[in-house]
Amino acid sequence: MNYKLASSPHQHVRRNTGQVMRMVIYALIPGILLQTWFFGFGVLVQIALAVITAVVTEATILEMRKRNFERAIKDYSAILTAILLAISIPPFAPWWVIVIGTFFAIAMVKQLYGGLGFNVFNPAMAAYVMLLVSFPVQMTQWLPAQSLTAHQPGLIDAIYAVFTGFSADGFSLAQLQGAADGHTMATPLDAIKTGLAQGLTYEEGLQSAIFDGSLGIGWWWVSTGYLLGGLYLIRAKIINWHIPGGMLAGAALCAGVMFLVDADRFASPLFHIFNGSLILGAFFIATDPVSASTTNKGRIIFGAAIGFWVYVIRTWGGYPDAIAFSVLIMNMAVPLIDYYTRPRTYGHTKRTKGEPK
């Protein structure tokens, strides 16, 4: 019997870019729903504004470049970037913040470098850093979980607040930010960082009303939602475990060592993993296939280094959370990491020391 030898590739992947991006968006849904439940409809308003801005910006630039914008938009990469940026900023940030940030992500970070597959930095995180540096007040107006607030804005209130700064009933963001017990510190990372700076111990800082044990009310639920989505992506083989595993392990190891050294001055590993955006960053942001490392060994190094920088900046830096800065730092190191972690080419032996190239 004669057998036909098929040409390569011998491993066939039926998913195209658009399908992969859609699956990542689907995996974000549990976390987005929980984030909306605990922190208000402003999350959905920001997502809507970001997606509209991303699509319009992408279509305009591609039209100017004489490219097929319909095919490019159908790959959903711009929409995914918009969603990641939208869920990273405060839900009630002014409308122009997300519009400027999304335009910057698509136009300056993605298209300026040549479009999908050519950007050096993660577009969503580059835009986040630009917004944080340019508009620090608007980017730090986080609200406590709605169960702690005296006023719980609905969808109409959220739309009013994003576009006018006031709810439909006339409450300002400062009034909405005030918790039922008068506590206005919005995020667990903010609360602990401020408490430690004021001389409180870690355990004393956890006595704030925004904590339930060592976990921020609402925040650990949101992190769990993104964790479930991330595990789905690994199971569906959309992403590998190397980057999220390395990132979580790197941050947890650093936190564990320092917590053992002085439990009064340093937060526990559990606190760092479930409070803030570490899980979101590990599964959905650092795993960007364009700006991340491409080898398995390199991915572990890349992820672990991001986890290290997250802990360092959170603990000793000027920003409570540090996912964006850490990802961008390691984006710059990707060429070096890939160079030294390239697997040996099949059929070639490893070059011995002193052997000419």
Swiss-Prot record:
Its cofactor is FMN. The keyword Transport applies. One of its GO terms (cellular component) is plasma membrane. One of its GO terms (biological process) is transmembrane transport. The keyword Membrane applies. Its EC number is 7.-.-.-. It comes from the Bacteria. Belongs to the NqrB/RnfD family. Part of a membrane-bound complex that couples electron transfer with translocation of ions across the membrane. This is Ion-translocating oxidoreductase complex subunit D. It comes from Pseudoalteromonas atlantica (strain T6c / ATCC BAA-1087).
